[in-house]
């Protein structure tokens, strides 16, 4: 990998009172300002001298009263968990790096940003030394802000605390208050129609939360997109209308974490034209960790697949030949090859008895022609048999699995899904995720 790296880490700066902290993008177009206002954590965002976010709130709400009571720690009865937090210090850094994806539109991607980490605390004192368990009501909370030339991203980090508390996050406070007149291209789910609506409670569309990324046309003529990056073990976020002209991140449900922990990134990118938002999409990849598959370039091959629904031997072998003639790279066996996909009793460890082909022989024939084989497997079978499926499919010579009808949204299913992808990588099996899954750039980490 060809890369250059410039990192500047300034010494921690003690912050007193409610002093504002500013962060700019490398090209100085984005200007992010953090401050404390009436005990709340808020920010403002401009782009090229034009206002983007008038004011937005930062933070989460946490209900830890059961754990606090059980561990003999004073119960935090705050209505807003981040109310009255103290800024301990602010750290700044900059990074400029080139990395090379193994596929996609670009052979190289620049990861260039300025970063500000705001360290906050509530309860206890500044002494976090020692390894022993203590019973102080002390919570640590970091706000990480990155300013790219492509946009600005915010992440919440929970450092490990000496009192060892688990965190039960009930909702997220992150909001985006825009100037009156902004309009959103609202869509509620993957295959729904996008409606251009004003950010007003009177608009019927806002009875449902908006999917992300959400595209906006601002009153000053700019376009913006709000989205989520690096989601792998948290609940899915959507956007709800908190008040007229004010959007708020909405969690699918509550989440439980163990510190130290990073929440997903929330980002906003801005452009003079809508095409600018598309051209800046690489920022979403940059907000994710580098590739974790050492030999990814040796076996991950993008390509076009021919979907086969008539699952008999003659059709499957003819489909392989069709791919050769048409310059396609894969065939994909659709639902039904191992039995009724919606039945928990259907095992994806063997071809259904009413089928007349052998999977290993099919894969061998396809390989001899330079064609790979994908198979559809419903989540019901994946959930029950994944650890048995993967070594078998690698032995058969399967190239990839199309995950069917996966559950999404909850922390449980989000974590399960991403762990399943990790396991597939261990057996050199590619993954295509069906249905309501929303990419958040994790394909950089696991291409």
PLM feature segments, named:
Residues 173, 213-215, 320, 363, ...:
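Short amphipathic alpha-helical segments and helix-helix/interface helices
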Residues 135-137, 148, 312-315, 384-385, ...:
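Short, glycine/acidic-rich beta->alpha junctions
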Residues 9-18:
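Hydrophobic h-region of N-terminal signal peptides that target proteins for export
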Residues 1-4:
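Positively charged n-region of N-terminal signal peptides that target proteins for export
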Residues 335-447:
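Aromatic- and carboxylate-enriched substrate-binding clefts and catalytic-loop regions
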Residues 122-124, 147-149, 180, 271, ...:
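Short, flexible loop/turn elements at secondary-structure junctions
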Residues 21-290:
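N-terminal accessory beta-strand-rich subdomains and adjacent acidic, glycine-rich linkers
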């Amino acid at each position: 990998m060809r890369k250059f790296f410039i990192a500047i880490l300034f010494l921690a700066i003690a912050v007193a009172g409610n002093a504002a902290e500013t962060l700019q993008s490398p090209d100085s177009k984005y200007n992010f300002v953090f401050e404390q206002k009436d005990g709340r954590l808020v920010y403002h965002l401009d782009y090229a001298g034009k206002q983007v976010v008038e004011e937005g709130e930062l933070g989460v709400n946490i209900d830890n009263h059961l754990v606090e009571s059980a561990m003999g720690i004073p119960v935090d009865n705050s209505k807003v968990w981040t109310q009255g937090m103290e800024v301990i210090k602010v750290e700044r850094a900059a990074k400029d790096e080139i990395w090379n994806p193994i596929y996609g539109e670009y052979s190289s991607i620049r990861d260039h940003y300025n970063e500000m980490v705001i360290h906050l605390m509530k309860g206890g004192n500044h002494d976090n030394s020692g390894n022993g368990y203590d019973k102080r009501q002390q919570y640590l909370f970091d706000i990480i802000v990155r300013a790219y030339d492509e946009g600005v991203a915010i992440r919440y980090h929970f450092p490990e605390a000496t009192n060892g508390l688990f965190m039960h996050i009930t909702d997220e406070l992150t909001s985006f208050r825009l100037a009156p007149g902004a309009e959103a291209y609202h869509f509620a789910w993957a295959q729904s129609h996008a409606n251009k609506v004003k950010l007003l409670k009177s608009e019927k569309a806002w009875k449902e939360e908006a999917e992300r990324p959400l595209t906006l046309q601002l009153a000053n003529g700019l376009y913006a997109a709000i989205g989520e990056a690096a989601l792998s073990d948290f609940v899915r976020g959507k956007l709800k209308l908190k008040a007229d002209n004010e959007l708020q991140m909405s969690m699918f449900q509550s989440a439980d974490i163990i510190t130290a922990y990073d929440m997903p990134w929330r980002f906003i990118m801005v452009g003079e034209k809508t095409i600018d938002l598309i051209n800046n999409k690489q920022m979403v990849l940059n907000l994710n960790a580098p590739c974790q598959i050492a030999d990814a370039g040796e076996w991950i091959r993008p390509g076009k697949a021919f979907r086969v629904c008539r699952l008999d031997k003659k059709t499957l072998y003819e489909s392989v030949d069709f791919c050769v003639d048409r310059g396609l790279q894969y065939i994909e066996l659709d639902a039904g090859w191992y039995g009724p996909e919606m039945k928990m009793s259907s095992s994806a460890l063997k071809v259904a008895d009413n089928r007349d082909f052998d999977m290993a022989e099919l894969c061998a024939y396809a390989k001899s022609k330079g064609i790979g084989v994908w198979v559809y497997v419903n989540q019901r079978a994946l959930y029950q048999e994944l650890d048995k499926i993967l070594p078998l499919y690698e032995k058969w010579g399967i190239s990839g699995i199309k995950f069917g009808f996966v559950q999404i949204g909850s922390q449980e299913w989000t974590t399960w899904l991403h762990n399943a992808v990790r396991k597939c990588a261990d057996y050199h099996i590619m993954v295509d995720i069906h249905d309501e899954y929303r990419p958040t750039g994790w394909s950089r980490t696991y291409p």
